[in-house]
Amino acid sequence: STGISFQPQNSKLSYKKGDYMIDTTRSVFNFAPNIDFRYRFSKVSQLRFNYRGRTGQPSMENLLPIVDNSNPLNIRVGNPGLKPSFTHSMRLFYNTYNAELQRGIMTHASFSATQNSISNSTEYDDQTGARTTTPKNINGNWSAFGMFGFNTALKNKKYTINSFTNVNYQNNVAFLYNQDTKVDDKNKTTGLTLSERLNGAYRNDWFEFG
């Protein structure tokens, strides 16, 4: 199945500083497509794929061309050129089971990436020590996850083994001010997590252990 939804969003902002005043309203429609695919190989084996898209709007404070210098050492400037972010999320599932062998397999994989994320760009004034921060769009934020599960019976089906393996990877980007070049560099942070859970059990007509 496939579908597309448009989600209306209404925002209002009132800003006043001295004689300067802004009173504005924003109305947008957020685009949110989705795809859901399922295929059944048999009664005990199936595949499923899911896709979701999500739009994220910049805040009104970030969009308006306002210079907030109420703190002279921490100045914030809005950015009217900010684009909405859009996140792609995909998930894949597969499972199968053999009743005769009492053996099952489960897999799950997912991936998510965001276009036009918002990160703060910061500039420093060496003479005054002031810091000016402006929100800007940035690309490169994504993550991936994978899981493999396996369980089976052994030796007259009195023993069972269960295994779950997980892997998770994160790739995050942000602006980082370079003191030497006086410009922002794209800073990347990555993280990898691996985990394994293995257990066994024994069962007979009298008791179960594990």
Model-predicted segments: where are they?
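Exposed, low-structure sequence patches enriched in small/polar residues
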Residues: 1-210
